[in-house]
Amino acid sequence: MFDYSIFSKELENLKEQGLYTYIKTLESPQGAWLTINGKKVLNLCSNNYLGFANEERLKKAAIEAIEKWGVGPGAVRTIAGTFSLHNELEKTLAEFKKVEATIFLQSGFVANQAVIPAITNEEDAILSDELNHASIIDGVRLSKAKRYVWKHRDVKDLEEKLKEAKDARRKLIITDGVFSMDGDLAPLPEIVELAEKYNAMVMVDDAHGEGVLGSHGRGIVDHFGLHGRVDIEIGTLSKAFGVLGGYVAGKKELIDYLKQKARPFLFSSPLSPADTAAALEATKILQESDDRVKRLWDNAKYFKEEMKKLGFDTGESETPITPVMLYDAKLSTNFSKELFEEGIFAQSIGYPTVPKGKARIRVMISAVHTKEDLDFALEKFEKVGKKLGVI
């Protein structure tokens, strides 16, 4: 019989290093406040940027979709699993993103694994920022293309790698739009310039930019005014959109090609009618108004400024993502536990999600937080920070 004790030993090692992830179970919907183990806590760690996860319009749309379409698609999309509702979501997303077409998949993670191996192979070169998301890294591995990893946000190093890859059949530059652990932005205008100079494609994973950056939350491409110059945009429907799923946005030819070649599209069922309808409603709300996006930024600005006044190191974030840098993994884990006791749910982030020695509490601000919520958080951060000798 297989000896499972090897896993037990590995788990003990993780605990000793302060790297073991303790999973808390929610007993309430997503929102500014959560109930966990019967305790009401302020939520500072979800990706529910705009509060859509428990938005009445989205819930109503999901319920109506279940009544009309049922609970599941029943097949993959190429056989009998494409509803007109699915097509409507893709059309509306394309209008929102100002692209020719989109294709949605089961998650943002899956979207990266769908597109990268579909458009590259061993004859090609992929140039990837060293801090790109795990889903990009896995997608690159699946493609079998030659990989060139460039220093984080360093366009000079990217150019050197492009020169090294000059003989590749096809060159694909991939970057996160917003880097989820630090909140910094990709230098997308400079990347696009290099891509045009060296005849490369540009792909940006905008999971943390959608609903956050650009007009009405259209994302980093809109933020920099680069419509038509970025070949592939990867989006998620599970963060600012508050639902589930991911999608690829770009030229019609690309999207049509993916519908023939992307394995997760061909061999896995699509989103349920409820998820599809809710995501569609979220897109419509963003098209109508950017009030929530503005509230998100106002909240983030206030919280960051006050945290810096208290003496916390909040890194170099350019977005509502606020890393509270503690560096030591055990300190970060203890800080998170102390915050929870004080009524704040803010998770510690350590290796392998971030490099060793870069542990932090990643604070995720939402449009649904009130000033009173933020002041409560600041009070508790100050208390715990002083108790643990951080400030």
Swiss-Prot record:
Pathway linked to the protein: Cofactor biosynthesis; biotin biosynthesis
List of residues binding substrate: 133, 353
Cofactors: pyridoxal 5'-phosphate
InterPro entries the UniProt entry points to: Aminotrans_II_pyridoxalP_BS (IPR001917), Aminotransferase_I/II_large (IPR004839), AON_synthase_class-II (IPR050087), AONS_Archaea/Firmicutes (IPR010962), AONS_Archaea/Proteobacteria (IPR004723), PyrdxlP-dep_Trfase (IPR015424), PyrdxlP-dep_Trfase_major (IPR015421), PyrdxlP-dep_Trfase_small (IPR015422)
UniProt: pyridoxal 5'-phosphate binding residues: 108-109, 180, 208, 236
Keyword field contains Transferase: yes
EC number: 2.3.1.47
Residues with N6-(pyridoxal phosphate)lysine modification: 239
Catalytic reactions on record: 6-carboxyhexanoyl-[ACP] + L-alanine + H(+) = (8S)-8-amino-7-oxononanoate + holo-[ACP] + CO2
EC primary class: transferase
Taxonomic superkingdom: Bacteria
Alphabetical keyword list: Acyltransferase, Biotin biosynthesis, Pyridoxal phosphate, Transferase
Entry keyword annotation includes Flavoprotein: no
Family to which the UniProt record says this protein belongs: Belongs to the class-II pyridoxal-phosphate-dependent aminotransferase family. BioF subfamily.
Biological function: Catalyzes the decarboxylative condensation of pimeloyl-[acyl-carrier protein] and L-alanine to produce 8-amino-7-oxononanoate (AON), [acyl-carrier protein], and carbon dioxide.
Name assigned to this protein: 8-amino-7-oxononanoate synthase
Species whose genome carries this gene: Thermosipho africanus (strain TCF52B)
